[in-house]
Curated annotation (Swiss-Prot):
Its cofactor is Ca(2+). It catalyses: a 1,2-diacyl-sn-glycero-3-phosphocholine + H2O = a 1,2-diacyl-sn-glycero-3-phosphate + choline + H(+). The gene is PLD1. InterPro entries: C2_dom (IPR000008), C2_domain_sf (IPR035892), PLipase_D/transphosphatidylase (IPR001736), PLipase_D_C (IPR024632), PLipase_D_fam (IPR015679), PLipase_D_pln (IPR011402). It is an enzyme of class 3 (hydrolase). The keyword Cytoplasm applies. It is a peripheral membrane protein. This is Phospholipase D alpha 1. The lineage of its organism: Eukaryota, Viridiplantae, Streptophyta, Embryophyta, Tracheophyta. The active site is at H332, K334, D339, H661, K663, D668. Ca(2+) binds at D187, H372, H406, E722. It comes from Brassica oleracea var. capitata. C2 domain is a calcium-binding fold, and the binding promotes the protein association with membranes. A lower affinity toward calcium can be anticipated for PLD alpha due to the absence of two potential calcium ligands.
């Protein structure tokens, strides 16, 4: 049967199955006794636990709760709001009986896509078939209702944010908040006079903010509460390191600062991920050095309450699924929540809530500036914070290159800050143990309730919404019934409730986009349902999030309409760790497959329009790197790396990648998403890694009638200045072919300088072409002369792993 593209939203309801015959083993008096015995002694199957799933061809897009002991006529009455970007011939409903390990297939029902593609509502009983497409015993049917709405029917499709009344992303746990203030941070610190003049609307110029200095001030000035979550929190780092910008008490470590505040009576609560994984392959690759045990030991016996919290599964998974969650997934949110003084209220004792959200953990290896030096800070700010997990045996005593760290964070003020606080309270209530959260109601005469910090008329005001990837295993207070979950903007699964709103936010922003999208992310892989087979079975990969496919379909739609649209993506050269290792190579392989899927969509669309254009003029990938000549007076290590090692080669060539740890997307210079979530399945799933992100815009700086020139525009231009080492008039319009061609040319030049044998000057900028090629069919191929990353034996295109499970590396 012919496949159709379902690109839009599918509303589906699964009602019930009639007259189901599951073999009769659980029916009758003796069947009940058998089930009870099995349940009591913990063997066998116990009672029936029937559930239904929804698939679009090879992609699982919906799952009901389990109905216990209703073997003949299970009734679910569950509705689903499904974002789709899938080629499919059928919408498939599968009925299964859950087991402690795996599930027993009852049968499948098929609704042809051509019945729904034009938007008609389909409400019918559909015959359930076996694997050979024959009716199952008893002729059972499933009652379903379906209605499909294509993206063209969405009033926001291709429209951007049309007015200040834009309500935010629908069907989410947290609503959009008005009257907020947002500070945007590039890297942990920016030295004085780094950014040149970047004009904004109203005659203003962009002013960069300093993340770790602001976090230091926020913690230092807190009087009632300091709440922190992190993938890692390392007590030995200092937040203030710029000798030209000293602060009173700034030489103290994070650990000592938190102890000091707790001893003063401030409630200091930390939720740090408990790395209890036994997956040795990751540990030996250097991916999990979180210091969690050291942090717990440091605070033991102090007034700081530090909880190491594992990534516990929700209650609904099978034994295998629960083991996967607890052993393979992490708590990845990076937030700080404090009480803060009121701005401009001379002498007021009232306090408010301020929150920080983004990609930067308070741990080693994160402090950096936009200069991203490899060697020149090894005797100063990075001497005691040398981070280089990509070489075996790397150490400050053997010298650079260190691994520079590029990241993005945000500070949130106003009602949105309280949503971040509520997220912490939900997590602490679930995994924090003692109920020692500050009772804010008892401080209502001191801490003001959620209220705007800026008037809507103020031209600097923000509207902001909080998004998460999290489930009931990590957050308390989620509703239990599917109906209540749907009303709360949550997704119900097989007896687990999931907040998947980060993925929803990305999908909505991409669909709204008019002109261009700029992405920086630590990972870029997904939409595996659309990958070519090419040595894999795509349905076994389960990296099902839609973001890459949404991006390529957006570009295709613009090509078909003859409208300009560009997507710029910045990723690291490789995921942090030994680049030759199986896990890193597997991720690079998934990344190649993702890129190739997107480029094939673009090439086919260009060909259909009779265009012979370079697909990199529509979608282009970059990485960051630095290269420095040796200067007099530089740090001289006492030892040397092993001869002929990658470490030694990189040291002699004076080059290394700048690690892109960012999780950010900018759309049309008017909307920005910043958080902890990577563009992979772990982060976007909702039931894997726990994540948090903000999405916001300035209602007075939209791109509706003229280019947006608010803080988001200034932030992007500042980032481009950091990466390119220059500003140019063409950068003002990233949607123009002149802009993308210029950025591609510069990055090609910088790659040539980075990878050349000789070095006469410092690299003039950091933005490098991602070293792959795209052929006339859209296949991602080896960049001529570069099978391996410079100084390594690591394949740039990656290598499929024959033994690492995809769930670990996607």
């Amino acid at each position: 049967m012919a496949q159709h593209l379902l690109h839009g939203t599918l509303h589906a309801t699964i009602y019930e199955v009639d007259d189901l015959h599951t073999g009769g083993l659980r029916s009758g008096f003796f069947g009940k006794i058998l089930a009870n015995v099995e349940e009591t002694i913990g063997v066998g199957k116990g009672e029936t636990q029937l559930y239904a799933t929804i698939d679009l061809q090879r992609a699982r897009v919906g799952r009901t709760r389990k109905i216990k002991d209703e073997a003949k006529n299970p009734k679910w009455y569950e509705s689903f709001h499904i974002y789709c970007a899938h080629l499919a011939s059928d919408i498939i409903f599968t009925v299964k009986d859950d087991n402690p390990i795996g599930a027993t297939l009852i049968g499948r029902a098929y609704v042809p896509v051509d019945q729904v593609i034009h938007g008609e509502e389909v409400d019918q009983w559909v015959e359930i078939l076996d694997n050979d497409r024959n009716p199952i015993h008893g002729g059972s049917k499933i009652h379903v209702k379906l209605q499909y709405f294509g993206v063209e029917a969405d009033r926001n499709w291709n429209q951007g944010i049309k007015s200040a009344k834009f309500p935010g992303v629908p069907y989410t746990f947290f609503s959009q908040r008005q009257g907020c203030k947002v500070s945007l941070y590039q890297d942990a610190h920016i030295p004085d006079n780094f950014v040149p003049r970047i004009p904004l609307a109203g005659g203003k110029n962009y002013e960069p903010q300093r993340c770790w200095e602001d976090i230091f001030d926020a913690i230092s000035n807190a009087q009632h509460m300091i709440y922190i979550t992190g993938w890692s929190v390392y007590t030995e780092i200092a937040l203030v390191r710029d000798s030209r910008r000293p602060k009173p008490g700034g030489d103290v470590t994070v650990g000592e600062l938190l102890k000091k505040k707790a001893s003063e009576g401030v409630r200091v609560l930390l939720l740090v991920w408990d790395d209890r994984t036994s997956v040795d392959v990751l540990k030996k690759d250097g991916l999990m050095a979180t210091h969690d045990e050291e942090t717990e030991n440091f605070f033991r016996g102090s007034d700081v309450h530090c909880i190491l919290c594992p990534r516990n599964p929700d209650d609904g998974g099978s034994i295998v699924q629960n083991l996967q969650v607890s052993a393979m997934f992490t708590h990845h949110q990076k937030i700080v929540v404090v009480d803060s003084e009121m701005p401009s209220r001379g002498g007021s004792q009232m306090r408010r809530i301020v929150s920080f959200v983004g990609g930067i953990d308070l741990c080693d290896g994160r402090y950096d500036t936009p200069f991203h030096s490899l060697f020149r800070t090894l005797d100063t700010v990075h001497h005691d914070d040398f981070h280089q997990p990509n070489f075996t045996g790397a150490a400050i005593t053997k010298g650079g290159p260190r691994e520079p760290w590029h990241d993005i964070h945000s500070r949130l003020e106003g009602p949105i800050a309280w949503d971040v606080l509520y997220n912490f309270e939900q997590r602490w209530s679930k995994q924090g143990g003692k109920d020692i959260l500050v009772k804010l109601r008892e401080l209502s005469d001191i801490i003001i309730t959620p209220s705007p910090v800026m008037f809507q008329e103020d031209h600097d005001v923000w509207n902001v919404q909080l998004f998460r990837s999290i489930d009931g295993g990590a957050a308390a207070g989620f509703p239990e019934s599917p109906e209540a979950a749907a009303e709360a903007g949550l997704v119900s699964g097989k007896d687990n409730i999931i907040d998947r709103s980060i993925q929803d936010a990305y999908i909505h922003a991409i669909r709204r986009a008019k002109d261009f999208i700029y992405i920086e992310n630590q990972y870029f892989l997904g939409s595996s349902f659309a990958w070519a087979a090419d040595g894999i079975t795509p349905e076994d990969i389960n990296a099902l999030h839609l973001i890459p496919k949404e991006l390529s379909l957006k570009i295709v739609s613009k090509i078909e309409k003859g409208e300009k649209f560009r997507v710029y993506v910045v990723v690291p050269m490789w995921p942090e760790g030994l680049p030759e290792s199986a896990s890193v190579q597997a991720i690079l392989d998934w990344q190649r497959r993702t890129m190739q899927m997107m480029y094939k969509d673009i090439v086919q669309a260009l060909r259909a329009q009779g265009l012979e254009e370079d697909p990199r003029n529509y979608l282009t990938f970059f990485c960051l790197g630095n290269r420095e000549v040796k200067k007099e007076g530089e740090y001289e290590p006492a030892e040397r790396p092993d001869a002929d090692s990658s470490y030694m080669k990189a040291q002699e060539a004076r080059r290394f990648m700048i690690y892109v740890h960012t999780k950010m997307m900018i759309v049309d210079d008017e909307y920005i998403i910043i958080g902890s979530a990577n563009i992979n399945q772990r982060s976007m799933d909702g039931a894997r890694d726990s994540e948090i992100a903000m999405g916001g815009y300035q209602p007075h700086h939209l791109s509706h009638r003229q280019p947006a020139r608010g803080q988001i525009h200034g932030f992007r231009m500042s980032l481009w200045y950091e990466h390119l080492g220059m500003l140019d008039e063409t950068f003002l319009d990233p949607s123009s072919v002149e802009c993308i061609e210029k950025v591609n040319r510069i990055s090609d030049k910088y790659w040539d300088l980075y990878s050349s044998e000789s070095l006469e000057h410092d690299l003039p900028g950091h933005l490098l072409r991602y070293p792959v090629d795209v052929d006339g069919e859209g296949d991602v191929t080896e960049f001529p002369g570069f099978e391996f990353f410079p100084d390594t034996k690591a394949r740039i295109l990656g290598t499929k792993s024959d033994y690492l499970p995809p769930i670990l590396t996607t």
